[in-house]
Amino acid sequence: GSIPACGESCFKGKCYTPGCSCSKYPLCAKN
């Protein structure tokens, strides 16, 4: 389990950091 490279969690199914997605829900990860 590697740590996603985005410093945020999913919020209402979205990630607001550019280039990040909710693919590692509940954490955001690089697309």
From Swiss-Prot:
Keywords: Cytolysis, Disulfide bond, Hemolysis, Knottin, Plant defense
UniProt note: domains: The presence of a 'disulfide through disulfide knot' structurally defines this protein as a knottin.
Protein name (database record): Cycloviolacin-O14
Pfam families: Cyclotide (PF03784)
Disulfide bonds: 6-20, 10-22, 15-28
PROSITE patterns: CYCLOTIDE
InterPro entries linked to this entry: Cyclotide, Cyclotide_sf
Superkingdom to which the source organism belongs: Eukaryota
Biological process annotations from GO: defense response; killing of cells of another organism
PTM per Swiss-Prot/TrEMBL: This is a cyclic peptide.
Crosslinked residue numbers (Cyclopeptide (Gly-Asn)): 1-31
Expression by tissue: Expressed in leaves and petioles but not in petals, roots and runners (at protein level).
Entry similarity comment: Belongs to the cyclotide family. Moebius subfamily.
Function of the molecule: Probably participates in a plant defense mechanism. Has hemolytic activity.
SUPFAM superfamilies, per the entry: Cyclotides (SSF57038)
